[in-house]
Amino acid sequence: MIKFPVLPKPLPLGEVSRNVTERARPLLEDFSMIYDTLNNLPNYLGVSDNLDTVIEYIMARDITTLPAGRTRIDGDKAVVTVSTVTPQTSDKALFQRHDNHITLETDLDGSELFEVSLAELTPTKPTDEATDTTGGTAGTSIAGMLCEGRFALYLAGEPYKSGLKAQGCGKLRKAVFSIELDPDEEDETEE
């Protein structure tokens, strides 16, 4: 039987607390990726210092106006890359895994499908240390659709595919936030 997470109750607007670690961190320990609306991003404050930086960055501006290319939010700890992507079919895409950072993706214009695997990644390419990316194959466990106003947060070590073709959808403009693990999170992934 699949066990679905019970998300924390959203806080009233204006009462977002930085002390939600006790509510949100168990989601990251017991479950896979997070899929939610951008309006709910403040509910995830307190999970990670570097994720907090990205959440505050997103909530403070109209991200649809971000320029194409790479923008540093906090040095190399938090970076956003905005690009236009031509979606591909799932059979043509490899799963990817990042061991030293989490990835938050949102579509600025258009829609795409994504897949996440709860299984181990079988590498088919050597790890690119510069981008912390390992490509390979894995069984699909979760699939969904990403569109404007929604985000997917892929956890470190979690195989996923994104930028997959959704029926009736063409090119899309997306923002990909690469977020380094906090030092205490790195210790947890090494255990």
Predicted segments, located by residue:
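Conserved short histidine dyad/triad with adjacent acidic residue
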Residues: 80-98, 108-122
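Short, conserved beta-strand element in jelly-roll/cupin
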Residues: 99-112, 118-120, 127-133, 178-179
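Conserved metal-binding segment of the jelly-roll/cupin
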Residues: 145-164
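A short, N-terminal "cap"/entry segment at the start of jelly-roll beta-barrel domains
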Residues: 2-82, 92-97
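A short beta-loop-beta micro-motif enriched in histidine and acidic residues
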Residues: 75, 91-103, 120-125, 139, ...
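A short hydrophobic beta-strand segment most commonly corresponding to one strand
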Residues: 151-153, 169-186
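Short acidic (Asp/Glu) patches
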Residues: 83-99, 127-140, 159-161
